[in-house]
Amino acid sequence: MNDTIAAVATPLGKGAISIVKISGNNALNILKQLTKKQDFTPRYAYVCDIFSNNILLDKALAIYFKAPYSFTGEDVCEIQCHGSPLLTQNILQACLNLGARLAQAGEFSKKAFLNHKMDLSEIEASIRLILCEDESVLNALARQLKGELKIFIEEARNNLLKLLASSEVLIDYSEEDIPSDFLNEVSLSLEKQIASFKDLLDFSNMQKQKNKGHALSIIGKPNAGKSSLLNAMLLEERALVSDIKGTTRDTIEEVIELQGHKVRLIDTAGIRESVDKIERLGIEKSLKSLENCDIILSVFDLSKPLEKEDFNIIDALNRTKKPCIVVLNKNDLSPKLELEVLKSHLQIPYSMLETNTLNSKACLKDLSQKISAFFPKLDTQNKLLLTSLAQKNALENAITELQNAKNHLETLELFSYHILSAIENLNLLTRPYETSQMLDSMFSEFCLGK
């Protein structure tokens, strides 16, 4: 980690500006040779000519950040040049020719971590912030990058250290009875701490589900209007629509966004009794999709009375016990479907929508609202967020240890053991891992210039 490294810090491609970043003991010397300028005041921007082997490459902006007051904690130099990919690579190559090494993925951030400029929670936040596509999460990630998760964990750790110290004092005077007020006070303190951890964990789990996307299966018997519904929601002809039964023989998946939530639409084969082997396989996949989805859109044909196939679908819906939106299609035709019978057989949470123009704006707006009603309401204001499986596992283990400690309040040695184990798990959220392999895995998610 003592090498001087260099990399392009901006995305590849043409643009107004590209940034070449250098970090290490030799960074300033390399900048001086590139610019043929000897004096750089830290944190001042200089317009400089950039040279390579005495050949002028560009007129650019150069900034020097003196250690330890830089992102990495080392001497850092930035060259903000014109955004030509060829020019940028030539400037980077000039840095390498002068003794810098090409940075590995995430190596700048790794230097920042090892030089105590950032902790693990801030590193995790910066990774997720770069990859984030959900506007509602940006605030939580920005607060984590600012260090608020670290502060939250440090406060919890300090509270637990106080409990541990009190317990150790009582162990030294083990011949005396444990004061009842101590037991009550510690029990309440642990309950409060466990509740705050669970709140963080629950919010993070819900946000993870939101990022993954809600799976929405569209089912119904053949020609009920499933594919028309999918096409209307996508605003394109994604699925083939035909009067011939069994046209859709496999599931079709597409992703849309509804009110800030990612939704995976799954159009399925029409459910009916069939002798066609391929169609039967499609129907089996349709029924399987009900097990794996979060919400169901079940399309019924209002112009036809309920048939055996409809009741088979209703039975399948009831077995899933999942929320359902019942779409009653073709209400412009003479209604023959026994609506009250349908309602009486449904044993799951559902809402209902009638339409015959599945591509109408009013219908789609109504349908979107009904779908969104099933989404969990996430209040992201003033919320912290766990951004990795490692963080989640560490906090879950800490909660388990605190619950164990609460169950052993009257056995101080066991109580202290579980409190100490909880503290060790909290350390994993913000403090260094013991293995370089885990560090390398985490930092490899970054680009070269980060």
Swiss-Prot record:
Subcellular location(s) per record: Cytoplasm
Domain TrmE-type G: 213-376
Keyword set, alphabetical order: Cytoplasm, GTP-binding, Hydrolase, Magnesium, Metal-binding, Nucleotide-binding, Potassium, tRNA processing
Function (record text): Exhibits a very high intrinsic GTPase hydrolysis rate. Involved in the addition of a carboxymethylaminomethyl (cmnm) group at the wobble position (U34) of certain tRNAs, forming tRNA-cmnm(5)s(2)U34.
Assembly mode: Homodimer. Heterotetramer of two MnmE and two MnmG subunits.
Assigned EC number: 3.6.-.-
MF-aspect GO terms: GTP binding; GTPase activity; metal ion binding
Amino acids binding (6S)-5-formyl-5,6,7,8-tetrahydrofolate: K21, E78, K117, K450
Residues given in the record as K(+) binding sites: N223, S242, I244, T247
Residues bound to Mg(2+): S227, T248
GO CC, alphabetical: cytosol
Name this polypeptide is given: tRNA modification GTPase MnmE
Binding annotation for GTP: 223-228, 242-248, 267-270
Cofactor: K(+)
Principal location: cytoplasm
Homology family: Belongs to the TRAFAC class TrmE-Era-EngA-EngB-Septin-like GTPase superfamily. TrmE GTPase family.
GO biological process: tRNA methylation; tRNA wobble uridine modification
Enzyme class at the top of the EC tree: hydrolase
Cofactor note: Binds 1 potassium ion per subunit.
